[in-house]
């Protein structure tokens, strides 16, 4: 995959230090380090400590990963352990396929 030229701004909403929250953060960090190679900013928001942020951003369930930039805003709700689902949700997997097809032509 060619280096990404975009900077991704992501928010991960979690509910405390639960096993689901810890697993979501660990999985997401692995994906980001492998796929985004330093061109991302990740903000982790604990909705138990900052319920107003969850309300403002219309977060109804955790964990929720929101891609703020580049547009459009996308949200992945629930289990983040499926790498492919996360990449599709962030529009990254589609870009990989498009680049591979362009190189094949």
Swiss-Prot record:
Function noted in UniProt: Key component of the KaiABC oscillator complex, which constitutes the main circadian regulator in cyanobacteria. Complex composition changes during the circadian cycle to control KaiC phosphorylation. KaiA stimulates KaiC autophosphorylation, while KaiB sequesters KaiA, leading to KaiC autodephosphorylation. Phospho-Ser-431 KaiC accumulation triggers binding of KaiB to form the KaiB(6):KaiC(6) complex, leading to changes in output regulators CikA and SasA. KaiB switches to a thioredoxin-like fold (KaiB(fs)) when bound to KaiC. A metamorphic protein which reversibly switches between an inactive tetrameric fold and a rare, thioredoxin-like monomeric fold (KaiB(fs)). KaiB(fs) binds phospho-KaiC, KaiA and CikA. KaiA and CikA compete for binding to KaiB(fs), and KaiB(fs) and SasA compete for binding to KaiC, thus the clock oscillator and output signal pathway are tightly coupled.
Keyword Metal-binding recorded: no
Keywords: Biological rhythms
Domain of life: Bacteria
Gene3D superfamilies xrefs: Glutaredoxin
Domain-level remarks: Has 2 forms, fold switches to a thioredoxin-like fold (KaiB(fs)) when bound to KaiC.
Stored HAMAP family: KaiB
Protein name according to UniProt: Circadian clock oscillator protein KaiB
Subunit-structure text: The KaiABC complex composition changes during the circadian cycle to control KaiC phosphorylation. Complexes KaiC(6), KaiA(2-4):KaiC(6), KaiB(6):KaiC(6) and KaiC(6):KaiB(6):KaiA(12) are among the most important forms, many form cooperatively. Undergoes a major conformational rearrangment; in the free state forms homotetramers as a dimer of dimers. When bound to the CI domain of KaiC switches to a monomeric thioredoxin-fold (KaiB(fs)). KaiB(fs) binds CikA, leading it to dephosphorylate phospho-RpaA.
Keyword Heme: no
Ranges in coiled-coil conformation: none
One GO process term, biological-process aspect: circadian rhythm
One Pfam family this sequence matches: KaiB
Family, per entry: Belongs to the KaiB family.
